[in-house]
Amino acid sequence: MRHGVSYRKFSRPTAHRMAMMMNLAVSLVTSERIVTTLPKAKDLRSVVEGLITIAKRYSQKDPVCGRRLLLSRTSGNSSVTNKLLGVLAQRYKNRNGGYTRIMKNGFRKGDCAPIAIIELVDREKDLKVIGS
């Protein structure tokens, strides 16, 4: 029975699954929009929202501790940590969760897997379209 299990295994060992999720999270934070399969997007949402919440929490009260925590969570990627603490923490300071949007995008041609676009809400490109 799988009572209380809140993640998918993706037919991968634990270390591979965690590395895959962190690589997807780094890609999403840097480009703010990626295309992946629907189950991966649904699991990625909780990872990215956790990173943004950590950045919001620590950006004002203890930035050094927050930077160290985010560096350990993002495999030492300093550009992603800087973007989380600088840009994204300020962008979402008045939003309590719900930082990502998942849109279904049909099926993959080879194996008919459901494809989704996951993106950060209130992106700069979205704001330019609304403002013009």
From Swiss-Prot:
Keyword Ribosomal protein carried by entry = yes
**A matching Pfam family:** Ribosomal_L17
Q: Name one GO molecular function term.
A: structural constituent of ribosome
InterPro entries with a match to the protein in the record: Ribosomal_bL17, Ribosomal_bL17_CS, Ribosomal_bL17_sf
What's in the keyword line of the UniProt record? Ribonucleoprotein, Ribosomal protein
Q: Name one GO biological process term.
A: translation
Note whether Ribosomal protein occurs among the keywords: yes
GO-annotated cellular components: cytosolic large ribosomal subunit
Q: How does it assemble?
A: Part of the 50S ribosomal subunit. Contacts protein L32.
Q: Which family does it belong to?
A: Belongs to the bacterial ribosomal protein bL17 family.
Q: What is this protein called?
A: Large ribosomal subunit protein bL17
Q: What organism does the record attribute this protein to?
A: Anaplasma phagocytophilum (strain HZ)
Its taxonomic placement starts with:
Bacteria, Pseudomonadati, Pseudomonadota, Alphaproteobacteria, Rickettsiales
